[in-house]
Amino acid sequence: MTPKELMYLEDSLGMEQQLETKCNDYASKIQDESLRTALTNLASQHKQHFNCLMNQLNQ
């Protein structure tokens, strides 16, 4: 993996982690159940993206 590719993956990891955290934070503050569910689902997707990127780094 080139240094540029590694930097891209590291940046993407940070963004996915931040997005997961924000979605979970907003979900905990929202009273509307449908919005809470949507944000929780988004947080799960960002966690999956994070895990996928981590798997690429560990190969």
PLM ranges: what are they?
Residues 1-59:
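His/Met- and acidic-residue-enriched segments that coordinate or traffic transition-metal cofactors
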